[in-house]
Structure formats: structure tokens, C-alpha cells
């Protein structure tokens, strides 16, 4: 029994020992794992930070090929760095849009991307995130220079992109810069070489490439074009070509826009390598956001301003943007609507403003809850104005792409919005067809004419009160016609179908201003029609014009090879026909009248016209030579035609033509022009002042009397001969001194006559007083007291002497000799009463007897009365 019990005890001890061994082994494994982990953590802490970052970058790069765009819903689903994800979360960017889902993965893999999506779909983040990740992968620093270049077409869009970049990339160590026009160039050039991510406009970037010596882009890694179709078109063609030449060929390129370009020529300029085309909404039913309600109205040109005012009065709590065709329209209508006070804030944004003013207007409109912004197409692309309710296109857009970008300022990122397009009857058919081809749903709506407010009379009153506002209205009129004429699609835009007189009245003008380029266009069209009707007559005219080419010049023939040249007419006939077709304004009639005053002036104008006709403009451009008051189309010289005589054929064929050209190129100086005017005996800028009696008081400029001046007027030599001018001035100075001397003598003569009259009156008064003298022997009461006011005023004659001293010393001596006054001292004081002598006396010498009786000029009774008064006062 004992053994059995002992055996059972031994069997119980063995499992307990095994359990203890197992627990020890488990503890040992746990301890070893813990020590291994601590050892690894210690090693990681000992490793430099850059090495840890590089390993993390390596893990991110390994995940790039595994990106599946269909599975991504958030930014955290992309293999992005912690710094980028933190910036996105802090800026409240969590969910991705369709364009971001499909382009970020391709850009992270280093491919060239052409992305197109609807307006307000988040294209800015689609290129900012890959740009940040690229520089983070390369561990870029400020010492490495420029790594990413973002080019925007407008300053406002560049500023908006810069703000988004600052939000998302604030946790990174890169430096970002904004380079746009309107800022201090010197300050920008001092900082530009430290910038890693540069956001700019094309013009200012090219200026820095030309003028900033230490700015270079040889290490550029990524080029991004925002609104690429606008940057690559004709407006920026030369600038972009120059910029691309300075960029390295080996780089990544991203192009984004709402209306993307597929031109092979444009893409070849950018040196794209196997680009990925991402058209997110290519298969969508409409090319505009589904939340956008789009309508159009048909309105006559003269009623458009009334419709706009009535619309704003009925939408006082809405935020609206009104697009115009030109800057002059925005400037004028902004001023007028500020005076009309529609009931909500009115702002203006156009290209003629200073940069700080543009930024102020942009930020002000962003903050306003209810306002209206008058803008040109600089606000049509990319700008993200929050909570815009209405987009009104006051002037018809150039094409469907411009329409899409304009209406894209509302209905941003799943928000609602409304768009209204104002069309003329001549524009309706062609524009609606274009929009239908681009899958833009537009519905026509009607206006209730009873709710339209007529503001034409109020505008006329404003123009009558303000001359500057009237000039702005005239510029607005001409600028609108020019913008319509320059449109490419002539099926939609026909300037000759516009009611010009009615449109001028709607702007507040009494009559339509003179539009010179339109008159010239109409003349050319009439000549063309007559030549098509009578081809035989046209050939005869061509022969006549060819025979007179030595006088007229050959450049116009090269521009118009069809031979349809205008018929030569005299200046008077042209002006007469122009006035019959278009009644000019008062200013125009004055100009035409002054042009035809003399035969010589008309000949000079014909010469100038011949010179201007040799300038190689195209037909559409040469009509703007006379209109220099509006510079909306100052960059149109891109379309000039340049021809060179390589083999010197023209000089051999027409030596007489070359001789005439050399004569015509001789420039007349301003001095010669002024002398020509003087020869015609025009009195320029003369001002003559007459008295009430008709006598000449003053003439300006004064007439030169010397013979040298008259001889110089007849001299045709250019420039100024200083020696001759000095001689003329000396001669003229003699005449001036003589004239001045005569004036002084006349002034002194008048003064002497006045003094004689005063002395004569004093003598007569003394003579009358002698017959009524009464002697006062004693002081008797207040009634018989001496009145000092009866004495003559001594200061009267003293002041006259002081005035004589100030006039001139010579005249003072002359008056002293003739007046002969006596000055005596009595009791150490100067006598208070000085009176002019009754007769002329000789000069007193200094050795004269001081005890001679003093002649005060008073009667005997007055002298006695004065003595008694003085004695009483001493006692």
C-alpha cells in the first residue's frame, strides 16, 4: 500500500516539473523577443533620420505599381507620405474626386498626364499632391533649386493655386514662391533662386529668365500647366516657346484643363513621352456639371443694359458674376451702376487694374455673401469663388469652350448654380448649335417686358454732368464693336448687323461716335462688291494701279495678291462719303475740318497714309491704326506679314521706287512741323486780354519785335541755335526794358498829379478857413476844448514818402526835388505834421539857419490855437 501511495506521489511531481519547465521556456522566448525589439528600437534611434525617411520612401515606392484607381475612395488609400496626409486632413480634404482618383496614381508612377474634367472637380489637388510627393521622394532641399514649375494663365488663378499649396504642403520642408506681374521684380529676383516649387504666370517667368542672372531651371523635375489649352494657344505662343527652350528635356509634364487640347503640334512642343490621356467625363451625357441650371435669352442690343439692371434689382440677396467682352465695357458700366445704386455691392475685375487692386477685389468678392462682380475673361478660368449663385454672360462668348469655363464659376463640387446667356438675334442660331455640339444643355426662356426698368434717361443725365464718364462711354462703344469684329466665327458675330445708333443711345450717348476702322472695312467691302460686279472695269483699274505703283508702293500689293485694291480718291471725296454713311460726332467734324484747311496739310496726310499703307499688317489689323485710344488689341501684331528681298530683285527692277521710299522715310522734326504751322500764319495758343474800353492789356505769348526773331522764323533749319537765341533774347530784352521804363514813368506821373491835386485842395481849404478864424484865449469847458481831429493827418504824407522809397531811389529823389518838403526837429523829436509846401523851393543845405520860422501850412488862428493847447498840456 505504501509503495502504491509513493508511486502515485512520484507520478504527480513529474507533471508539475514539466509545467515549470514549459513556463520558463515561454518566459525565455518572450524575454528574448522583448530584448530583440528593444535592441531594434535602440538601433533605429541610433540611425540618422534621413536613413529612416529613405527606407519609408522605399516602402512607398514599392506600393506604387499596386495602385488600383477603382478601389480608392480616400486620400489615405494612396501610398502618400505622412506629411502630405496630415496636410490634407488639416485642410479638410479626405474624399477623392474622379479626376484625382485617376490621375494621382499615374503621376506618382512618373508618367506624363493630360487630364480633363468638368469645372469645379478638384483638378488643383490632382497635380499638387504628386508634385509634393515627387520632391519628398527625392529629399529635395532649398539648396537644390527649382524642382517643380506650375504655370497659370492669370494672376488670380496662380494666387489661388499658391494658397492651396500652402495649406496642403505646410508640413513639408520645401520652399514655395508666387511670381506674378504687378509685384516688385527686384524683391522677387533676390528670393527666386531659393524656391523649390514656383507658381507663376508666363510673362513674369520669362522676364526673370531674361533679367535674373542666377535664376536657372536646369534641375527641373516636373512641369505643370494649369488651364493648358489657354496657355498653349496663340496668346502665349511665343512666350511659352521661349520658356520651354530654357527647360530640360528630361522631366515629367502634367497638363490639366476643363477643355483639354489634343493638338499633336502643341504636345510635340512640350516633348511629352507616351502621355496618359485622362478624360473623366468624356462619355458623360453633358460636359457641364449636372447641378448647373443653364438658360439663355434673346435680347436686342439696345435693351441689354436695362435687362441687366432689372435682373440685379430682382436678385439683391444673390452672389453673381457678369462677364463682358472688353475692359472698357467693365470700366464704364461699373461706374454707371455705382451711380445707379442697384441695391447690392458692385465690384469690377479686369486686366487694366493694378495687381494690388485686383487682389483686393478678388478677396472682397470671396468674403461677400451678396454682391455682383463685373469681369472680363480673366475671371473665367480656374477661380474658385465660393457660393456663386448666378453667372451672367452679358456678351456672347467666343466659342463653346469659353462658355464652359465661364459657367464653371458656379456649381462647384456638387453644389448648385444657375447660368444665363444673353444673345442677340443674329447670334442665337450659331451659338446654340455650337453648344449642342459640345453637349451643353441650354434652354431658352422669355423675359416679362413689364418688369424691365428703363434707365436710359438717367444714364444720359450722368453723361451730361460728367465729361470723363462720357469719354468712357465712347470708348466702351468702340471697344465693343472692335471685340465683335475680331471674333473668328463670322456666322455668329456680324458687326454690320448691329444697330449702332440705338446702342449708342442705350449707353447714354446723344449720337454714335465715329468708328474709323468700321468705315474703312465698309469701304473695302463696297469696292470688292463693285469689282465682282464689273470684272472688266476691275482689270482696267488694276492696270492703272500697277502703273502707279512707283508712287503708291508695292507692299499693299503683296498683302492683297488678288489685286483687289481700293480706287484712288481724293481726301475731300473720302471725307464726304464717310460723313454720308456715318454721321460723325462733333469731335470728328472738327478733326475733318482741320485736316482740310490747306492743300499742304492734305498732301502731308497723303504721304503719311502712303507710309502707313506700307506697314505689313493683315487686312483685319490695318484698320486700327487711327484708333489709338483703346489698347485692348495691342498684342495683335503677332499676325504681321514680314517679307524680305533676299536676292535684291526689287531694287534692280524699280530704282525709282527705292528713291521715292528713301525720300518718304525722311522724318520731319517737331521744330519743322511747328515752323510749317507758323508759315500758314496760324496763331496757336494766343491769349489776349482787353479792358472794358477795348484797350489791349496783355497778349500771350508776347509778340517778338526784333528783326533777328523774324529772320529766325523764316529759317527752315532744324534744331536750336543757342548763339542765335542769345542774340534774339538780348534784342528782345532791350524792348522789354524800354517798355518797363515807360510804365514806371507813367506810374510816377499819375502819382505826381494826385499829389498836386491834394495840395491844391489843401490850399483851398486853408483859404476858406482864414475867413472864419476865432481865437481862443483861455480854457473854457468841454464844448470850447481844442479838438485834435481838426488837424491834418500827418501819416498821409509820411506814407506817401515811404511808398516812394520802395518804388525806386531815382524816382524818390525826383519827387523830393519837386515837392521840396522841410523837416525840422523841435525839442529832440520829429515834428508830427509834415505838409507839402505851397510853392516849389530849392534844396536846403545842411548849413541852413535852424532859427528860421517854421511854416506848418496852417493859418495864423490855427497856429495860435495849437500853441495854447501845447502850453496847457505841459502845465
Curated annotation (Swiss-Prot):
Bias kind Basic and acidic residues: ranges: 529-541, 569-580, 752-771, 810-819
Protein name: Probable ATP-dependent RNA helicase DDX10
Residues covered by the Helicase ATP-binding domain: 104-278
Motif DEAD box boundaries: 226-229
EC code: 3.6.4.13
Motif residue range(s): Q motif: 73-101
Example GO biological process: rRNA processing
Transmembrane annotation, as ranges: none
Molecular function, one GO term: RNA helicase activity
Entry's family note: Belongs to the DEAD box helicase family. DDX10/DBP4 subfamily.
Job of this protein: Putative ATP-dependent RNA helicase.
PROSITE patterns (alphabetical): DEAD_ATP_HELICASE (PS00039), HELICASE_ATP_BIND_1 (PS51192), HELICASE_CTER (PS51194), Q_MOTIF (PS51195)
Cited Gene3D superfamilies: P-loop containing nucleotide triphosphate hydrolases
Record: residues binding ATP: 93-95, 100, 117-124
Residues forming coiled coils: 736-773
Boundaries of every Helicase C-terminal domain copy: 291-453
Pfam families, per the entry: CTE_SPB4 (PF13959), DEAD (PF00270), Helicase_C (PF00271)
Chain residue ranges for the region called Disordered: 528-633, 653-672, 743-856
Species, as recorded: Gallus gallus
Keywords: ATP-binding, Coiled coil, Helicase, Hydrolase, Nucleotide-binding, RNA-binding
Catalytic activities: ATP + H2O = ADP + phosphate + H(+)
Compositional bias of kind Acidic residues: 624-633, 800-809
GO cellular component: nucleus
Comment on protein domains: The Q motif is unique to and characteristic of the DEAD box family of RNA helicases and controls ATP binding and hydrolysis.
